[in-house]
C-alpha cells in the first residue's frame, strides 16, 4: 500500500540542528516490480517542487526503515529525489536473498523503474557503503543508461578476494560468519562468535552461526579456488563494463581497501573522471579506534563530497573536484593527506629489506633482523603450526562488528610473545621512511605438510616498544602459483612464495623500527589450514605442521615496500 505524506523535514529529523528546512514529500513501502514478477519495497523521498529531478538510489539489505534519515534528507533539500530500497529477500521485499547473483538485474530493473516515474528526469546516482556499495558496482555492470555516477564506500569490487576468500586463497572466515550471524541468523537463535568460528568442518559452520543451512554459504564452499563460478560474478573480471564515473572511498584498516584502490587503477586508464579517497579508517569511517587517534585532519566531510560529485554528474554543475588530483590518501605516521595523480604513486620505488637471524627468530625475544643487506649466514628458522592453537587475530582489516571482532590498529606485542611467530625488525631508523603502496613478503619456505598457510604482517614499532599493525596477508600454499589451479606441496621441499600483505600508506618515523611477522595463522581473520592436503572446508580434524623459513645467500627472503623518495 503506497502512502503519501507531506512533512516538515525538520520535524522528521529533529536531531538535525539549524534553521527551519523545506517540507518534503515521502511515499513509503512502494512496490517496485522486477522482470521476474518479484516486488521489491522502496521508500521514495521528494522535494515538494513539481518538477522532474535527478534521483539518488540506495539499495540495502539492512532495512530501509519507515522514514527519512538525516543524511538522505540533506539530498532531498539539495534538490534530489532519494529512493531507498530493500534488496530482494530482505525486510519488506519479496523473493529469496541471493547476494551472489541477484544484484545486477535487480539494480538494472530498479533504475528503469525510477526513470519511468513522473518526478524523475532520468538521471540517477547511487551511494552507500559495504553491501550498499557493492550493489552499485553490480548495477554499473548492467550498463543501464540512466545510471550516471556511483559513490561506493568501503565496498571493493571482487567477490572472491574481498567478501569470501582472499588474495592468497584462504577464507575470511571471521568476516563472513560474523556478517551472516548479524544479519541472517534464525529468529531466537544465538551462538557466540568465539564458538561458531571454531566449528569443524568449516563447510557446515553456517549452521553453527545461523541455526540453519545457508545455500549461499554452501555454494561458496563448493568453490574454494577462483574458478568459472567466481569469474562469472566478479566485477573485477568485468571491469570494462563499468562506464559510469566512480568515486570510491576506503580505509587502511578496512577489509576492502586493496580492492578499492585496484578498482581505481583499473578504471583510470579508460577514463580521467574516477576518484579514490582512503583514510585511516576501518569498515565504519565514523567509529574511532579505542587506543589510537590520527588527529582531527583524518575526518572527512563525505556528504559534501557526495553532493559535489552528484551535482557534477547529475546536474551538470562543475565541481572543484574536477581540478584536483584524483587520488587522495591519508599517510599515517605523518598523519597528513597526500594527493596523487596515480595509484600507486608514480614516484614510489620498491625497497627490499632482507630477513636474517641466527636461527632463533621465534618471538619478540628472538634474533630476527631486517636489513637492506642480503643475509650472509646460512641459518633457517623453524616453528610448529598447530591449527588447534592458532595465532589470534589482533585488530587489522576485519569486518564488520568491532564489539565482536575488534578491528584497526592494535599493539601486537601479545602476539609476538608466541614461539610460532617469527619476528624480524630493523634497527631504529636514522631517518623517516615513507611507504605507500603494496606490501609483499617473498619467502623461501618448506613444510612437513602437503598444504599449509604462511602469513605476513607489517608492523610499525614505536620507540616505547608499541608494535602497531599496518597491514597483513596470507598465502595458502596450494595457491602459490595460481588461485585458479591449486597444487599440493611436496613435504620438506623448498618453495619460493610471495605473500600479498595488502596495501598501506605510512611514514616510519626516525627512531621507529620496521617489523615483519611471519607465521602460519591469523585466526579468525582467516580460516585455519588443516595441514592435510585435503579440502580445507571439509576437514573434520586438523594436524600440526613443522614450518621452515630459509634466509641465506641462496634463499634471499625479503620484505618489499614501495618507498617514496624525499623523506630520507
PLM region spans:
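N-terminal cap/lid segment of alpha/beta-hydrolase-fold proteins
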Residues: 18-50, 425-431, 444
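Proline/glycine-enriched tight loop/beta-turn segments at coil->beta junctions
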Residues: 38-40, 47-56, 120, 241-242
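Alpha/beta-hydrolase fold nucleophile elbow
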Residues: 118-131
Amino acid at each position: 500500500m503506497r502512502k503519501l505524506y507531506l512533512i516538515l523535514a525538520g520535524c522528521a529529523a529533529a536531531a538535525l540542528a539549524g534553521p527551519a528546512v523545506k517540507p518534503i514529500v515521502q511515499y513509503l513501502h512502494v512496490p517496485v516490480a522486477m522482470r521476474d514478477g518479484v516486488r521489491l519495497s522502496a521508500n521514495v523521498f521528494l522535494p515538494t517542487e513539481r518538477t522532474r529531478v535527478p534521483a539518488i538510489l540506495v539499495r540495502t539489505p539492512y532495512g530501509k526503515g519507515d522514514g527519512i534519515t538525516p543524511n538522505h534528507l540533506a539530498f532531498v533539500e539539495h534538490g534530489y529525489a532519494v529512493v531507498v530500497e530493500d534488496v530482494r529477500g530482505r525486510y519488506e521485499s519479496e523473493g529469496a536473498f541471493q547476494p551472489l547473483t541477484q544484484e545486477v538485474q535487480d539494480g538494472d530493473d530498479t533504475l528503469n523503474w525510477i526513470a519511468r516515474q513522473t518526478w524523475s528526469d532520468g538521471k540517477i546516482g547511487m551511494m552507500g557503503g559495504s553491501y550498499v556499495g557493492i550493489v552499485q558496482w553490480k548495477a554499473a555492470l548492467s550498463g543501464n543508461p540512466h545510471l550516471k555516477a556511483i559513490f561506493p564506500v568501503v565496498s571493493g569490487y571482487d567477490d572472491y578476494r574481498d567478501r569470501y576468500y582472499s588474495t592468497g586463497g584462504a577464507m575470511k572466515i571471521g568476516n563472513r560468519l560474523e556478517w551472516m550471524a548479524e544479519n541472517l541468523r534464525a529468529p531466537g537463535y544465538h551462538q557466540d562468535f568465539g564458538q561458531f568460528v571454531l566449528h569443524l568442518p568449516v563447510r557446515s559452520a553456517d549452521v553453527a552461526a545461523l541455526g540453519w543451512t545457508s545455500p549461499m554459504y554452501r555454494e561458496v564452499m563448493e568453490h574454494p579456488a577462483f574458478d568459472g563460478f567466481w569469474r562469472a560474478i566478479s566485477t573485477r573480471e568485468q571491469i570494462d563494463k563499468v562506464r559510469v564515473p566512480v568515486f570510491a572511498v576506503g580505509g587502511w584498516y578496512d577489509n576492502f581497501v586493496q580492492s578499492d584502490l585496484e578498482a581505481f587503477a583499473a578504471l583510470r586508464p579508460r577514463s580521467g573522471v574516477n576518484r579514490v579517497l582512503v583514510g585511516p579508517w576501518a569498515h565504519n569511517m565514523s567509529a574511532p579506534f579505542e587506543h589510537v587517534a590520527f588527529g582531527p585532519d583524518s575526518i572527512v566531510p563525505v556528504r559534501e563530497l557526495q553532493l559535489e560529485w552528484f551535482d557534477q554528474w547529475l546536474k551538470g554543475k562543475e565541481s572543484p573536484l574536477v581540478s584536483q588530483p584524483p587520488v587522495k590518501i591519508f599517510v599515517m605516521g605523518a598523519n597528513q593527506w597526500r594527493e596523487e595523480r596515480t595509484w600507486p604513486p608514480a614516484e614510489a620505488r620498491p625497497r627490499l629489506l632482507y630477513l636474517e637471524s641466527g636461527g632463533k627468530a621465534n618471538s619478540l625475544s628472538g634474533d630476527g633482523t631486517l636489513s637492506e643487506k642480503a643475509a650472509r649466514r646460512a641459518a633457517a628458522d623453524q616453528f610448529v603450526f598447530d591449527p588447534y592453537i592458532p595465532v589470534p587475530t589482533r585488530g587489522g582489516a576485519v569486518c564488520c562488528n568491532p564489539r565482536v571482532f575488534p578491528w584497526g590498529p592494535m599493539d601486537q606485542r601479545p602476539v609476538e610473545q608466541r614461539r610460532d611467530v617469527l619476528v624480524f625488525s630493523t634497527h631504529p631508523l636514522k631517518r623517516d621512511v615513507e611507504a605507500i603502496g603494496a606490501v609483499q613478503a617473498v619467502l623461501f619456505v618448506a613444510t612437513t605438510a602437503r598444504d599449509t598457510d604462511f602469513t605476513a604482517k607489517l608492523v610499525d614499532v614505536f620507540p616505547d616498544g608499541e608494535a602497531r599493525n599496518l597491514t597483513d596477508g596470507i598465502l595458502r600454499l596450494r595457491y602459490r602459483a595460481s588461485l585458479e589451479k591449486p597444487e599440493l606441496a611436496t613435504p620438506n621441499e623448498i618453495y619460493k612464495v610471495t605473500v600479498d600483505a595488502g596495501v598501506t600508506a605510512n611514514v616510519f618515523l626516525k627512531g621507529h623500527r620496521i617489523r615483519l611477522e611471519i607465521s602460519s595463522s591469523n585466526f579468525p581473520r582467516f580460516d585455519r589450514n588443516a595441514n592435510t592436503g585435503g579440502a580445507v572446508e571439509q576437514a573434520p580434524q586438523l594436524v600440526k605442521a613443522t614450518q621452515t623459513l630459509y634466509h641465506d645467500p641462496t634463499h634471499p627472503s625479503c620484505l618489499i615496500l614501495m618507498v617514496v623518495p624525499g623523506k630520507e
